[in-house]
């Protein structure tokens, strides 16, 4: 394991600066994770002496202090005993000015390897060791010293809060994962300068770097040698920018957690702005050098667009129009610049003011310097894309997301002078190397933070995720289902006749059609982007169906007046709802014809000539005599008991009926409760009916005969009646006593007669 002094110096810089300034902070997670994971170095004193000048320039929030106390623990200075004493002084100077050294950033949920040196994590995440440790740091030191000037100018400028990041996690398009391997090399090459072309917002770290650059007028980078002469304010600001880039790299990596490096240059590595250059260049595996060469070739075409894009950053009117242009140019330029900086020995001295114009001028100078050695550096710079996936392996908690990346354009001394005018700059996360294969665009609408940068930590920007993929397919599928659902079930109103006259919809079919139409209308309202041609066809179909339903409803209302509408023409069916004898059906009869037929039947009944006319002995008279009419009326009258008895008919006499009538007569003579007229006792009645007595509900409790006591016949009822039996016994004893008295009197008379 190679532990460099540069990493050690960087850790001391960040720890000291984080400890000294505990008043204001942004993106606290990366700030505390960085000093903990950095390795030791013998050049600690040099780095600390260089950082003391600008420690107070770094604002931090209480969240940063809390996070720091959690992760770093007892590492206020972040120094450890040096393990590599042979590293040159140039490396230590380089580590001070460059914030791309080996860094392991540890969050709550994941650990991100920024550098190739093995480091320890707080959460005991698996350590990732570098695959190539023998890569010469002398070459990297001066190359990254050039990049340090670039990274200080170009920082990630997007303000992302926890709410937006939580939305972006669920809204990133998974279709971008297919392009990750093709873009991995380009991603690594453009990680530190990702926002050079599309810097939509200036952060606090950007303003601090602008300060550092104004103070860095004495610092010079020697192109031939590996040593750098860098002022102390530059070192402190480099450490600050290192920490800031850590925070922003982690935030966008958390946003793109499902697809590790799909949103390459704009999401994941634009926020790592300038700290990852050593991470990429010290890796051993070169996965896709051809695409990096192609991206370097595209730099010549888009080199002229850098200055235009820098001007567009300061203009609010041209922000939305140049969105795709900014994406293309920034991607290609960053790729070429990434590969050219490790071998570029030319000095890059950037002098910037607090205003954005000086920043863009310095960017153009940097790009001009970088373009010199892009072809010589394509094959020499080893790139490993596994570092890209490491950002997606680690996760951050919700508390960390709230305090992580709050990119605020804040300047401690001059807030009003720096105004980058980035109100509603749309930030596209789709990589351009895929060239039109991305189906989704991540639109981050960020608010204006010109002078109120301190309060912008509490702001929550909205994240708009527009899905363009699969809408036509879903629309076509909906139309297909409509065509299947629109099949109508019809009923033949004239069975057996012509089956193509009238067709009616059932009530269920009508309800289902109306429900389908309502659902489809709601779906059409919800869909924001649909093809106009398909939509017009659907509307035509709906209009035709509505016309058909309206016509059928009008017919159905005219059929019947009953509450239950069967949906059939009852009159056409001859007054029958269901007729199984379709052959004998007499349909469409008019009332006039029916009246005429009735009259014919009546006349035929009175006719003398009948089918059996030949069998008669004489010709029957046409009109009957009065006597005959009286006989007929009498016969008809005798059939019923008359209107007084409601037309009660005489039943057919049977033996059972005769026995019942006899019992009734006997009871009449023996039961004092019954009284019958004398006329009713003679013979049997002619008109009578035998029925069952239905109990009144009120008689259920007081005058009801239980089921067990009910008898089958009248005789059994009489025998079961206790009162009737008592009465019968008494009468029987009286009769018997009378007979005995009569018999005794007769005997007495006879004896007396003999005596005489």
Curated annotation (Swiss-Prot):
Residues 548-605 are annotated as: TdBR region. This is Deoxynucleotidyltransferase terminal-interacting protein 2. It is found in: Nucleus; Nucleus, Nucleolus. It comes from Homo sapiens (Human). Regulates the transcriptional activity of DNTT and ESR1. May function as a chromatin remodeling protein. Part of the small subunit (SSU) processome, first precursor of the small eukaryotic ribosomal subunit. During the assembly of the SSU processome in the nucleolus, many ribosome biogenesis factors, an RNA chaperone and ribosomal proteins associate with the nascent pre-rRNA and work in concert to generate RNA folding, modifications, rearrangements and cleavage as well as targeted degradation of pre-ribosomal RNA by the RNA exosome. The gene is DNTTIP2. Widely expressed with higher levels in testis. The keyword Metal-binding does not apply. GO terms for biological process: ribosomal small subunit biogenesis; RNA processing. The modification Phosphothreonine is found at residues 129, 232, 610. One of its GO terms (cellular component) is nucleoplasm. Residues 35-55, 80-96, 242-256 have a biased composition (Polar residues).
């Amino acid at each position: 394991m190679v532990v460099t002094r540069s990493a050690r110096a960087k850790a001391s810089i960040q720890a000291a600066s984080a400890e000294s300034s505990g008043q204001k902070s942004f993106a606290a997670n990366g700030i505390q994770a960085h000093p903990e994971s950095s390795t030791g170095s013998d050049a600690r004193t040099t780095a600390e002496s260089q950082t003391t000048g600008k420690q107070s320039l770094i604002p931090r929030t209480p969240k940063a202090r809390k996070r720091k106390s959690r992760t770093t623990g007892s590492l206020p200075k972040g120094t450890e005993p040096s393990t590599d004493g042979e590293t040159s002084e140039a490396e230590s100077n380089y580590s001070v000015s460059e914030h791309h050294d080996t860094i392991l950033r540890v969050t709550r949920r994941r650990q991100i390897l920024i550098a190739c040196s093995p480091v320890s994590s707080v959460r005991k995440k698996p350590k990732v060791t570098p695959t190539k440790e023998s890569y010469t740091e002398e070459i990297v030191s001066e190359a990254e010293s050039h990049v340090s000037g670039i990274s200080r100018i170009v920082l990630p400028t997007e303000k992302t809060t926890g709410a937006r990041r939580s939305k972006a996690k669920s809204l990133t398009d998974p279709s971008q994962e297919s392009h990750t391997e093709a873009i991995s090399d380009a991603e690594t090459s453009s990680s530190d300068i990702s926002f050079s072309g599309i810097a939509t917002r200036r952060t606090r770290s950007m303003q601090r770097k602008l300060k550092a650059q104004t103070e860095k007028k004495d610092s010079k980078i020697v192109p031939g040698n590996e040593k750098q002469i860098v002022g102390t304010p530059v070192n402190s600001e480099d450490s600050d920018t290192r920490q800031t880039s850590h925070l922003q790299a982690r935030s966008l990596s958390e946003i793109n957690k499902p697809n590790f490096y799909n949103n390459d240059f704009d999401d994941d590595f634009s926020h790592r702005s300038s700290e990852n250059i050593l991470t990429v260049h010290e890796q051993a595996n070169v996965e896709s050098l051809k695409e990096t060469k192609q991206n370097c070739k595209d730099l010549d075409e888009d080199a002229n667009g850098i200055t235009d894009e820098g001007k567009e950053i300061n203009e609010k009117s041209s922000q939305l129009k140049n969105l795709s242009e900014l994406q293309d140019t920034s991607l290609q330029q960053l790729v070429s610049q990434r590969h050219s900086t490790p071998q570029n020995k030319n000095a890059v001295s950037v002098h910037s003011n607090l205003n954005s114009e000086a920043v863009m001028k310095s960017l153009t100078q940097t790009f001009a310097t970088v373009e010199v050695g892009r072809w010589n550096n394509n094959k020499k710079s080893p790139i490993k894309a596994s570092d890209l996936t490491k950002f997606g392996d680690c996760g951050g908690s919700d508390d960390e997301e709230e305090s992580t990346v709050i990119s605020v354009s804040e300047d401690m001394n001059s807030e009003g002078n720096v105004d980058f005018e980035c109100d509603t700059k749309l930030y596209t996360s789709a990589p351009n190397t895929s060239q039109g294969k991305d189906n989704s665009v991540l639109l981050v609408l960020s608010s204006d933070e010109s002078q109120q940068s301190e309060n912008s930590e509490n702001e929550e920007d909205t994240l708009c995720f527009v899905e363009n993929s699969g809408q036509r397919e879903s629309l076509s599928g909906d139309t297909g289902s409509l065509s299947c659902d629109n099949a109508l079930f019809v009923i033949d109103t004239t069975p057996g006749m012509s089956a193509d006259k009238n067709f009616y919809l059932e009530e269920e079919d009508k309800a289902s059609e109306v429900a389908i139409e309502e659902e489809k209308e709601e779906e059409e309202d919800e869909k924001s982007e649909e093809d106009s041609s398909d939509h017009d066809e659907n509307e035509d179909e709906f209009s035709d169906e509505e016309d058909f339903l309206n016509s059928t409803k009008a017919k159905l209302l005219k059929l019947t007046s009953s509450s239950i509408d069967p949906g059939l023409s009852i009159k056409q069916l001859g007054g029958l709802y269901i007729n199984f004898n379709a052959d004998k059906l007499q349909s469409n009869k008019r009332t006039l014809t029916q009246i005429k037929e009735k009259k014919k039947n009546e006349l035929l009944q009175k006719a003398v000539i009948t089918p059996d006319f030949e069998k008669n002995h004489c010709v029957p008279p046409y009109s009957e005599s009065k006597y005959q009419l009286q006989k007929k009326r009498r016969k008809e009258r005798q059939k019923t008991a008359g209107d007084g008895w409601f037309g009660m008919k005489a039943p057919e006499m049977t033996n059972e009926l005769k026995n019942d009538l006899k019992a009734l007569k006997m009871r009449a003579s023996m039961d004092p409760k019954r009284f019958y007229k004398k006329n009713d006792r003679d013979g049997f009645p002619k008109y009578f009916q035998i029925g069952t007595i239905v109990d009144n509900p009120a008689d259920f409790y007081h005058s009801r005969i239980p089921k067990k006591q009910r008898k089958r016949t009248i005789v059994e009822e009489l025998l079961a009646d206790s009162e009737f039996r008592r009465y019968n016994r008494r009468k029987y004893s009286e009769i018997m006593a009378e007979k005995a008295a009569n018999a005794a009197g007769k005997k007495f008379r006879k004896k007396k007669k003999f005596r005489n």
